[in-house]
Amino acid sequence: MALPLAFLFTSPGPVLVEIGPITIRWYGLLIATAVLIGVSLSQYLAKRRQVNPDLLSDLSIWLVIGAIPAARIYYVLFQWSEYAQHPERIIAIWQGGIAIHGAIIGGTLAALIFAKLKRVPFWQLADLVAPSLILGQAIGRWGNFFNSEAFGRPTNLPWKLYIPIERRPPDLVSFEYFHPTFLYESIWDLMVFALLITLFFRSLAGKPRLKVGTLFMVYLATYSLGRLWIEGLRTDSLMLGPLRIAQVVSLTGIALGLAGLAWLYVRKRPLPDVVPSAKDTGE
């Protein structure tokens, strides 16, 4: 007898293994995996564009330093009523509770500072990193599965997700199965990744040659579009009064992405795209 698909969507728990005082959590492992794969991919894309891959290695350190604390701060700010009562939990990032929009904001600011200090074009770096960002998001979303968090409304669809009673919202405690919104977003992110990689290699072959900044703008608009819909299904959205913060930010991301694309293709002078190669830097 075939097992129901819901059985496959039952989290084994947030902890992968405990070795003495050391606890390895799925969430941390997935974030580390996403970073490693993202750095490797961005270096590969840099080589294809004849850009020094070491530049992307250096940038990745800045992105992690900028993105992860910003993601946590963003989350804590919009859950301040809870963390004000338990301030010791503010730094407990291993328990979950980071916001991707905070990571995007923090990472972008870090990349801008990096580009300024290194005197390299920000937009070409952004294009090289965009596919890695969305792939990392697709991987990292599975941390929500293991933590039994960021799920959607109750559902009886075949791919429903079982949520333990202690993780259910108080007003939905009688329901067992919920929309696996982590899965929806992970699949959407993989689709955006496929689009960006296709555009990258077609541009590399000149079919057509994209303007610098295009990939990042496409990333911003398409990711935000998917998040706008998926956020509407969730039961634990960060709120500001009656507004779902992620939907407001997603609408802003769609507008900025589309406006950015229009700006890139209307302006007559293209953005600079000269980044030193390994040969130029002697590395």
From Swiss-Prot:
Lineage top rank: taxon: Bacteria
Q: Where does a 1,2-diacyl-sn-glycero-3-phospho-(1'-sn-glycerol) bind?
A: 141
Q: Where found?
A: Cell inner membrane
Q: Which GO terms describe its cellular component?
A: plasma membrane
Q: Name one GO biological process term.
A: lipoprotein biosynthetic process
Q: What is its EC number?
A: 2.5.1.145
- Specify the enzyme's EC class, one word: transferase
Q: Which PANTHER family match?
A: PHOSPHATIDYLGLYCEROL--PROLIPOPROTEIN DIACYLGLYCERYL TRANSFERASE, PROLIPOPROTEIN DIACYLGLYCERYL TRANSFERASE
Give the protein's recorded name: Phosphatidylglycerol--prolipoprotein diacylglyceryl transferase
* Name of the encoding gene: lgt
